[in-house]
């Protein structure tokens, strides 16, 4: 007998499988990929959130069918999600590959030429950087409120004295576009959050950026 939460993840995996099914039209597969991620976000927000609350309460709550504790369920969910993330990444690459012949391509910064990199740096400086606000977490500056489903760049910074700080930069903004055209390549785009992450060191010139990543809160 399968745990209810793990059973739901299996259901959502079937949605993901449709996104990777070559027999399904490409537009529908993109829709299935979007539905899969939206479902997973809601699952973590509601059901995993409830399990985490139960763990915080210190009360041992067991699931009726399998007798699993909240902690056991969360561990099992995380493991299952890691496996699904690998599958999702492979399907994403497959979908992106099929979009290229149709004139649509998402590109990473490291795939750009030096000239293209300079063009995007100018775009970042003029069109994006003025609208970004960095939050450095410290005892004097408490952890900021993170909005549900918004994208954030996070960084681990090191001061000249060797101390570490954490920084959070909201990347979701109605002022600048999320899809940035690469002017030298027709139909080629970059996500604004990828550009922000690449040029993150420009925002922290008095620090060394030791690590950086993108996160999204659910």
Residue map of PLM features:
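N-terminal non-catalytic structural scaffold regions of very large proteins
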Residues: 1-218
């Amino acid at each position: 007998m399968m745990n209810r939460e793990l059973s739901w993840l299996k259901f959502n995996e079937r949605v993901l499988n449709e996104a990777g099914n070559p027999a399904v039209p490409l537009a529908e597969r993109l829709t299935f990929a979007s539905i899969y991620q939206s479902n997973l976000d809601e699952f973590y927000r509601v059901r995993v959130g409830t399990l985490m609350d139960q763990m915080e309460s210190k009360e041992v709550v067991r699931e009726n069918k399998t007798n699993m504790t909240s902690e056991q369920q969360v561990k099992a969910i995380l493991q299952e999600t890691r496996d699904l993330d690998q599958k999702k990444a492979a399907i994403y690459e497959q979908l992106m590959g099929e979009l290229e012949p149709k004139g649509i391509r998402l590109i990473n910064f490291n795939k750009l030429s030096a000239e293209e990199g300079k063009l995007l740096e100018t775009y970042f400086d003029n069109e994006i950087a003025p609208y970004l606000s960095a939050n450095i977490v410290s005892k004097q500056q408490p952890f900021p409120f993170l909005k549900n489903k918004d994208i954030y760049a996070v960084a681990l910074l090191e001061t000249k004295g060797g101390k570490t700080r954490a920084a959070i930069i909201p990347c979701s903004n109605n002022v600048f576009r999320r899809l940035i055209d690469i002017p030298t390549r027709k139909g080629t785009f970059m996500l604004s959050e990828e550009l922000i992450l690449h040029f993150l060191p420009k925002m922290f010139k008095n620090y060394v950026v030791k690590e950086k990543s993108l996160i999204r809160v659910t």
